[in-house]
Amino acid sequence: MPTPASISAWNSRRNFPRESDAAGVAPQILQGGYTGTKWERDYGISSGSCNREEIGALVGGVIGGAVGARTASEENRTVAVIIGAAVGALVGSRIGRELDEADRGCFGHALEIGTAGRAVRWNNAATGVTYVVVPGSGEKLDGKSCRNFTLTAVRGARTEKRAGTACQTAIGTWAIRP
């Protein structure tokens, strides 16, 4: 897994698009995250969906499961991402393996800025899987901000639903607790 220093160096080389007006003024902060991070964009999360295409464009340069992302803070992040091999096991063998970087971005960002008890949905057209994450309550575990969730994956007549807890890592990604 990359170190925070390598992620920071990678982030500084990335040229993420910023929304701004003609004068180059930075956009207004739209959403405060569960962990206190201020996010420029919510990618549809607050309305119960996830703009998978936009998130996919941002997380295309994933390094070891950690992405560059842009927040209003100096951490320079754009999107929260869920990481770890446990993601595949959580959802189920076949469907879990099909979670790609954009799906992980939607999952992590739903944990970060989603409202407790409110479903966030998106569809991966390439795999035919529709995902629904319902962020739950949160707590501090081992000094980390953690959040319970349920994740449902639907493909055709097959539905898998799992519950779990994810905690934010030192570099701002979310990792599922074993």
Language model features by range: what are they?
Residues M1-T3, G60, A166:
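Classical secretory targeting signals
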Residues R41-I113:
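Short, low-complexity, glycine-enriched hydrophobic/amphipathic alpha-helices that associate
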Residues A5-I7, N11, F16-Y34, Y43, ...:
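Extended interaction-bearing regions that mediate binding to partners or small molecules
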